[in-house]
């Protein structure tokens, strides 16, 4: 029978501060996870990991049939799922032994206390995504549910929180309502309460009582994001390890606001109005367990002093920070990720000793600032350094002399010119795997490029040729991007690629090539040549590249008859051949005549350039 099979109780644990797909309910005793990993790409940590509640494979002795409301799914173990069946009234024929009830995604507007009062065993009640109002949910609606552990009321139309909730609660979700007021016993006097979700409401300071968590000192997760709070709530539970206050109206944090939160590990304060004056040296002083702090998108002009020494990830992007002083970061010896992008930093604003002693700091984001040169005193063990979108004009000999462990370096979209790159600038970067110099003002590839690099990007520069020996010794190169430059066919001789024995991807799209380059590496798998002036594909075009999987020739000058079919016969691995956007139906003779004239004009331009040189 279907009712005796394993049945998932589809209940939602609050997702990442927005309502998403229906997930399963978390079992009692959930909380902090053991191996907590941090990543700079995370906008925020997940609220909780969902856990499925299953009824047993082989149910124990019980009635052969279970009374079940129409269109609902019920099990003999007390799991009832009435989610998403367009209910407009509370089902009246629920089994009395129901312990998990799912009513999410319906049209319920009101619930009467007597409808719930006989469900004495109820442990989980999911009412999220209905049309419940505070008037339709009486204060004593949950009075008799003495075993209720999990209550989900997210995405309804509540303006006032229930005045009384059962004392056995473990997790409560009121997210995405219109709440303006919380009462003292809404969350108070609940010793088992572990997580409270109140994000995306209309809560202001006056709507939160000072004793909101009186008698509920074990709360570990509190989400108050996207409200109208101007002050940090008072008397927060000392067991908190995750506190979300982002997207509020905080301007300052008063002394002692976090003084009792020695267990706090994650603090989210982004998208507020915090200023330098709103934080003092002791604001975060007592947060001895804090690992993740997000202060992005505020009004800070400097890196705050007195940050916790336990920090692993620090978000300071999208402020107005102009300076990083000598001693504000150096005490944070556990710091691994530092995000300072989208500020107003200049090279002189970063003290040469700002990163001294930060041996664990491996990821630094400094992009979208106003740096005129590479900052001195970079962290010695940095592995990922993002300095794109600044105003850097050159790279000096000693700029990267101490960053031996650097693996990824992004210098794209600066103002770097070829003469201003010292030939020994990259000499110490023996571990570098990715180098991005796109969007600069390079006329030639800089000399002395790291030989062990796997990915080299020099897109959107002013390259007219690859100088002899520019890629010499780069046998480890896998991907080379030369997109949107001024490269011409005569400037790419077959010797240009001779050392690239492991090259798999070559992108020369958006240049001025009239022919397919010769002597390409045998290892090549993907060749991008779109948006050039290539007029023909001869029979021997790909003789040196039998391993090609993708050829992209879109938007060139190819005409009917100019592509020799036999050119592709040896390409046993070819999966994609893109030649759309060419002159497939043009007058071949006219096309060839026009292309010949273009070639003559190109040769004349090249001769003039040589005379100028």
Curated annotation (Swiss-Prot):
Changes after translation: N-glycosylated.
LRR repeat residue numbers: 97-118, 121-141, 147-168, 169-189, 192-212, 218-238, 239-260, 263-283, 289-310, 311-331, 334-357, 360-380, 381-402, 405-426, 431-452, 476-489, 502-522, 523-544, 547-568, 573-595
UniProt keyword list: Cytoplasm, Extracellular matrix, Glycoprotein, Leucine-rich repeat, Repeat, Secreted, Signal
Biased composition (Acidic residues): 600-613
Region of interest: Disordered: 588-613
GO cellular component, one term: extracellular space
Signal peptide: 1-19
Tissue specificity statement from the Swiss-Prot or TrEMBL entry: Kidney, heart, liver, pancreas and vascular smooth muscle cells. Also detected in aortic intima (at protein level).
UniProt biased composition (Basic and acidic residues): 588-599
Glycosylation sites: 214, 281, 299, 410
Single GO molecular function: collagen binding
Domain (LRRNT): residue spans on this chain: 59-96
An annotated GO BP: negative regulation of cell migration
Summary of subunit composition and partner proteins: Binds to type I collagen.
Entry function: Negatively regulates cell proliferation and cell migration.
The family this protein is said to belong to: Belongs to the small leucine-rich proteoglycan (SLRP) family. SLRP class V subfamily.
PANTHER family with a match to the protein in the record: AGAP008170-PA, PODOCAN
Protein name: Podocan
